[in-house]
Amino acid sequence: MRWSFLTVLLWLVSLTGAENGFNGWLRYAPVQCDKRCQRALPSSIVTLNSTDSGPIGTASQELQAGLENIVGKQLSIKRSSCGSRSSILVATLEQYRQACNRSSEVPSLGIDGFWLRAYGDTVQIVGENERGALYGAFEYLSLLAQGNFSHVDYTTSAHAPVRWVNQWDNMDGSIERGYAGPSIFFEDGHIVEDLSRVKQYARLLASIRINGVIVNNVNANATLLTSQNMDGLARIANVFRPYGIQIGISLNFASPDTLGGLGTYDPLDPSVISWWANITDSLYDRVPDMAGYLVKASSEGQPGPDTYNRTLAEGANVFAKALQPHGGILMFRTFVYDHHINESIWTNDRANAQVDFFKELDGQFEDNVILQIKYGPIDFQVREPVSPLFANLYKTNMAIELQVTQEYLGQQDHLVYLSPLWKELLDFDLRVDHQPSLVRDIVSGQRFDRQLGGWAAVVNVGTNTTWLGSHLAMSNLYAYGRLAWSPTDDSQGILQDWIRLTFGRDQNVLDTITDMSMASWPAYENYTGNLGIQTLTDILYTHYGPNPASQDNNGWGQWTRADHDTIGMDRTVKNGTGNAGQYPAEIAQVYEDLDSTPDDLLLWFHHVPYTHRLHSGKTVIQHFYDAHYDGAETAHRFLSQWESLKGRIDQQRYNEVLSRLVYQAGHSLVWRDAINNFYWNMSGISDEKNRVGHHPWRVEAESMTLDGYEPYTVSPFETASNYKAVVTTSNSTTGTAQTKLQFPSGTYDLGVNYYDMYGGKSEWTVYVNDRVVGQWEGNSENTLGHTPSIYIDGHSATRITFRGVEIENGDQLKIVGVPDGVEPAPLDYVVLLPPDVVD
């Protein structure tokens, strides 16, 4: 589709308007380029034998709009011979060879690859296909947007053919594990009418070389397959197609029964086979280039072939065969496990499930099936070993499943740059058959000579202008695309490209955000879960705040087996679940032995006393205490680092990021204290540094003089400072808590830890004597993206801080809380800190 001049103009205006995150890394902010600089750049864009509606047409429009915004130069678009001077030539490899007679100078190109040669005013962008040419155009614009006008001449091709993103969007417009607003695809059971945001999403994805999008939740609703909704899918596909992106959909295994009325969904039943073939034909009639299907079956209550005693391979192949006439791919998730297993049986282990279910099926899947394997054996934890399934399938296509949306990792309200986590997994050598077997080479198909393979990431963008709910979280989407294309790229290098494109080329900005981001995963691991114990979040509720007790005493299998004396899963072959033995011999030997197991996976593979000494010399329990304090201190440092950038970043994005970092600093303390108090209480072993349970700068709310407030026993107990909070005596009673301050006179940062529950917007006012020093409203459901909580717990716990408060010894501190809805203006404690002290 050809963009009108007005459309291009409006788009350019949008780029120069408010910096709200909508443009992501495609801001194309102006860089310094005087008239001499402009004369040295191309004057036109030449396309060879292409239509306006394809990716090359899109490339020409992107180049035209991008160069005008970046360097202020207007380029015409024309179709002519390859000999045009002062031009950007955009073509496929075949077009270039036919039109230019220069076959000898063209390098070889692999999957979706491109050749970019730029010498001043002469630029050649040649793609292995139209998609590759579009990627080359985005690459050239990325260089210019970062101020790089140097001569370049290189080729690059995709690491793997499949580079998809998954959206867990529901038909009602909600998004499972989405933290950035409603779906851009669905509402009220149908496809939305306005797909303008989908177009911008397509631009962002194409610029990082994503070639497929699964648009709906893996916990799929069969109503997506109605005629009306299939027509809607065609509209979505029409938006993505000019950007070289194919759409696919998730399927509900039981659809032949629930939607088709067959009374069965047995994958070997002829009527079921016919039903899926007909549905697939109908979809391809509407979307001829549909990428294929994604299926979650026999997992977490989702229907599957086990209902009829059929194998998972038989279940997958019914879809694969329906897709084969159309060239479609089936992505079949290996996230299959029993969530009712008995913890009292020492050898039970959810981590064994993927190999147990799929190893014996190797070679039984159709050639267009790719098994989509989560990076670890459990579920997107802050640290897991690589899934052993990658080492157990020789004759089956594989893809790695990552998660851009931060389900267990702070839900975009905590800064966590994920590329270093992913790189550690991708670079891991599984040593299959004692041969080099890097995970990245397994999923590409290279290691086992498979033709299909690749990448999937659960992204879950929403209608929030930042796409993911947080400006800084977009670094993870950018990094995913870069790694899916070239997994040998450096995490810091990827990050710095993103920073320059997103925030500009100010060196202070670059250095500061680099330092913050590269420290963020270790910090989050430190204050949420160490030594391979998993993310100690509430696995039964929000997957957000701390609740280590929720890991155990249930059938979900994310156990820690912590008791008074010991902690950790014994996954050895000798004494435990045998999970270590699922790895190839060289790796199994490392994990089987307590001494050779890396400290950061110790509690994943071994059950040890709290007093066990790590390679560092610390005991397990002291490492827990120290790491949680270190992590929280790092989160507080992020705040001061960001504040140093004031005036260097536009005000809107500066303030929005600042708000999240203020919250993260406070919530990291909730995490720190909850985990430390939990294990101190369980083990009875004190912190050698006497920090845990000792907070001399705090005043507990329940110790204050209360009027209209009453003490409340918090559950989990560890999510309140002294295991208690105060709440108003009724939802219509204003509460007052006051105390005489016994601190030396001076200037303090006054913090209040409270609970911001879903279902109410309480108001609080803090007084020193009769002077108001702070007021706020509990409205985090409007300002933050994490899954809210209706309880007083570690999800709703938070802190607000008022800086530079003058205090005299003996001053009267008073907090007045006005409840609202179900929220009884809950308070935990007040803290008065000298500047730069973290309590």
From Swiss-Prot:
Q: Where in the cell is it found?
A: Secreted
Q: Which sequence ranges form a coiled-coil region, renumbered to this chain? A: none
| Signal peptide from the UniProt entry | 1-18
For the keyword Chaperone, the answer is no
Catalyzed reactions: an alpha-D-glucuronoside + H2O = D-glucuronate + an alcohol
- Name the enzyme's class: hydrolase
Keywords, A to Z, come to: Carbohydrate metabolism, Glycoprotein, Glycosidase, Hydrolase, Polysaccharide degradation, Secreted, Signal, Xylan degradation
Q: Where does the protein principally reside?
A: secreted
Q: Which gene encodes it?
A: aguA
Q: Where is it found, in Gene Ontology cellular component terms?
A: extracellular region
The protein here is known as Probable alpha-glucuronidase A
EC number in record: 3.2.1.139
